[in-house]
Design a protein with these regions (language model features):
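Bacterial Sec-dependent N-terminal signal peptides
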Residues: 1-22
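A domain-start/cap signature at the N-terminus of enzymes
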Residues: 18-57, 105, 132-142, 269-271, ...
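Gly/Ser-rich "nucleophile elbow"/oxyanion-hole loop immediately N-terminal to the catalytic nucleophile
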Residues: 46-55, 100-136, 146-149
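Short substrate-entry loop that stabilizes the transition state in hydrolases
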Residues: 48-101, 184-187
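The feature captures the conserved acid-bearing segment of alpha/beta-hydrolase catalytic domains
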Residues: 50, 153-228
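Loop/turn elements at helix/coil->beta-strand transitions in domains of secreted/extracellular proteins
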Residues: 54-58, 84-90, 125-130, 148-154, ...
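Cell-envelope and extracellular/periplasmic
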Residues: 61-66, 118, 134, 141, ...
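Alpha/beta-hydrolase-fold serine-hydrolase catalytic core, especially in secreted/extracellular enzymes
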Residues: 200-202, 210-298
Length: 298
């Protein structure tokens, strides 16, 4: 019995250390009325090695409106993901002052926080960033990379109601948009955003979640993590100059039907019959499979 209790205690201590003790904060002063001092919560990935020659990527996580970031930076799900991929997590604690508009003040604050973090961890990559957000945070997770596309690699936005104006400047920044289909107003806005990008010949990965209102279904988080991990690994050259740049597929190989959640070969008869507004194109089977699996989750 004592052995069992000791084991349970060790597991609790290890879990607490893994997700709570690895976090810290950076404070940045701004001129924004309600944000004279902004706290940026960050998390160091497990087994961080300061002597490593290749660099560590950054994931910027924007929580819901006016979040303190304290819960997000200690997320077990995202903590596990960051440890697995060797990624630093940074979560802002913006409040009002139109913080989702990076060109006004919040973008500069984020870049200053990254610079400070880099002083402590010199092998952090301040380039080719990853972004994730939901609700008001989803606005940030697409507006921020649109503000600095040259410093961005990929973004995922869930339940978003405000998007950047589609631009060819974003053609090398990969995007994932998800939304509950019961979140009707945002769903319509999402469809319009994706269609505007399609007119520019730029593919945005898309998934709706049936019967979900303005919430965060686990399937959307799973898909976001699979999506960001895919591009994080595909573009390992961002972090190590000795790794060759990947050959990018110019033609999608699968097409998904957002209504029935199934995928088909792009040139198959069924694939060709999918309505334009329900079509989701995939350039890799890995992402196509993750898209299908996400629909089976609560």
């Amino acid at each position: 019995m004592k052995v069992i209790l000791l084991f349970i205690w060790l597991v609790m201590v290890f879990t607490h250390y893994s997700y709570a003790q690895a976090t810290d904060t950076i404070t940045i002063k701004t001129f924004a009325k309600e944000n004279p001092v902004v706290q940026f919560n960050y998390r160091e990935p497990a087994n961080y090695d300061i002597t490593l020659k290749s660099k560590y990527r950054l994931l910027i996580y924007f929580g819901g409106r006016n979040t303190t970031g304290e819960n997000e930076v200690k997320s077990k799900s995202w903590g596990t993901w960051c440890d697995k991929n060797g990624v630093f997590l940074i979560v802002p604690s913006y409040k009002n002052d139109n913080y989702w508009e990076p060109q006004k003040w919040s973008g500069k604050a984020l870049l200053e926080a990254i610079t400070q973090l880099q002083r402590k961890y010199p092998n952090i990559c301040d380039d080719k960033l990853l972004f994730y957000g939901y609700s008001a945070g989803a606005q940030c997770s697409n507006l921020f990379p649109a503000w600095i596309p040259e410093k961005s690699r990929a973004y995922a936005s869930h339940a978003c109601g405000v998007f950047h104006k589609p631009s060819e400047r974003m053609k090398k920044v990969f995007g994932l948009i998800t939304c509950g289909d019961a979140d009707r107003q945002r769903l319509i806005i999402n469809h319009r955003f994706i269609e505007d990008y399609r007119k520019l010949g730029i593919n945005i990965l898309w998934k709706s979640f049936p019967n979900h209102p303005h919430d965060v279904p686990w399937g959307s988080t799973y898909l976001a993590q699979a999506f960001l991990e895919y591009y994080h690994k595909l573009y390992a050259c961002d972090l190590d100059s000795t790794i060759p740049r990947p050959k990018e597929s110019r033609k999608p190989i699968f097409v998904g039907d957002d209504i029935d959640g199934a995928i088909y070969p792009i040139d198959s008869p069924i694939g060709k019959q999918i309505y334009q507004e329900d079509r989701v194109c995939f350039f890799s089977k890995e992402l196509a499979d993750a898209w299908v699996k996400s629909a089976t989750m609560p």
